[in-house]
């Protein structure tokens, strides 16, 4: 049976590339040594994300990235995930052309969203879809560089 969102424009119904795969780690320094030294990935950046109480690192691999996520506060969801499941896979992130329109379509389709509107992420506007709607997988969406949410969230113009 067709969804009400089936009439959405093509750019709202299609995902772009895999932006990154995120891994929860105890130590970015230890984990990045493996990914950089053993597998040859290039470390792009390490940064603190105070609002999420994590430290992250991005390592380039082809047109995508591996994101290492280290909790900086033992009371966060990321810290609880690490304590209960250990290091490993956390989420996959897909690029979309218009995040707000995509979230609206997903909501119309009945998916459970963690973020109902774009919010500021490390590399652009982001939102998460709850694992209950994704067969147990946490899915992040990131708006493509220069998309409509960039300016409203205070990101610089992307050229």
Please name every model-derived segment.
Residues 10-12, 79-85:
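Short, flexible, solvent-exposed loop/turn segments with mixed acidic/basic and small polar residues
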Residues 49, 71-72, 144:
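Residue-level structural signal for beta-strand termini and adjacent loop
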